[in-house]
């Protein structure tokens, strides 16, 4: 049986005993000395097994984090520890239908010693002939000397929908065999290399697309004109393919974008 609760002394000892690893080749840094590095799991799942949400993740700098559940099996939390220091813990505010959680496989190490550790929260739903899923990233900030662990950024990093569009042979002919409307959204968070002082700034790049051709959840595919061969391609949605710069705002006690994010409900709402 997998452990669902992790005691603070256990997290403390695992953090202190974490093996030293070289920095990941993909690590990035900005001009202020903030870095993004790999935050891998201490053990990998066997082939064919699902990833264990309770596995410990540790960095080369001896920062470690692990997910835990309460005794009811419903409430989730994250514990973060550094070396022999006192571990920190924060409850995760779960969204509707979120049932899968995992540690983000990257860690941001600030020049001043604090770190940002992420949790990926996933929700999904199924319906006749299709389904939808979405993942958001929640970043938590931890000080090297201990103290409160609190969320500072919450962003969508992935979403997908597959909606049935064929219900008989006529539909299959009209759709040229493309019998589902597909929606994809991907978001990536990286350090802003232009940052010269202070806390890290981030670049968030989002890309959204639909298939076949331009699709919208506001329209009924069964009443749309027949597809053409030229429609059998992915269409990049310019309204939901964008970039934003996030900076820390002390008044909000979190990161805010330089411009509002579009809603992109076709991809993110279900």
Name each model-derived stretch.
Residues 10-18:
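Hydrophobic h-region of N-terminal signal peptides that target proteins for export
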Residues 61-125:
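Short N-terminal edge-element motif at the start of the domain
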Residues 66-70, 126-132, 232-238:
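Short consensus segments that form the blades of beta-propeller domains
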Residues 75-82, 137-139, 243-245:
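Hydrophobic beta-strand positions in blades of beta-propellers and related beta-sheet-rich domains
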Residues 122-135, 183:
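His-enriched metal-coordination microenvironments in redox/metal-binding proteins
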């Amino acid at each position: 049986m997998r452990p669902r609760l992790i005691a603070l002394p256990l997290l403390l000892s695992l953090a202190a005993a974490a093996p030293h690893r070289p920095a990941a080749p993909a690590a990035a840094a900005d001009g202020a000395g903030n870095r993004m590095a790999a935050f891998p799991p201490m053990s990998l799942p066997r082939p064919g097994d699902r990833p264990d949400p309770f596995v410990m993740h540790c960095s080369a700098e001896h920062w470690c984090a692990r997910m835990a559940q309460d005794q009811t099996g419903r409430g989730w939390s994250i514990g973060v520890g550094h070396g022999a220091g006192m571990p920190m813990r924060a409850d995760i505010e779960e969204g509707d239908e979120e049932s899968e959680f995992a540690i983000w496989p990257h860690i941001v190490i600030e020049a001043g010693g604090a770190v940002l550790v992420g949790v990926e929260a996933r929700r999904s739903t199924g319906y006749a002939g299709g389904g939808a899923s979405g993942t958001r990233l929640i970043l938590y900030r931890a000080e090297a000397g201990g103290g409160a662990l609190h969320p500072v950024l919450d962003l969508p990093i992935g979403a997908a929908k597959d909606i049935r569009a064929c219900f008989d042979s006529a539909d299959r002919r009209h759709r040229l065999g493309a019998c589902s409307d597909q929606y994809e959204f991907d978001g990536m968070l990286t350090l802003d290399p232009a940052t010269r002082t202070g806390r890290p700034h981030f670049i968030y790049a989002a890309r959204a697309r639909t298939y076949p051709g331009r699709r919208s959840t506001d329209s009924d595919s069964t009443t749309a004109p027949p597809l053409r061969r030229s429609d059998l391609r992915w269409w990049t949605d310019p309204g939901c393919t964008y970039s934003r710069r996030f900076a820390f705002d002390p008044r909000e006690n979190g990161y805010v974008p330089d411009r509002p994010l579009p809603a992109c409900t076709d991809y993110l709402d279900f």
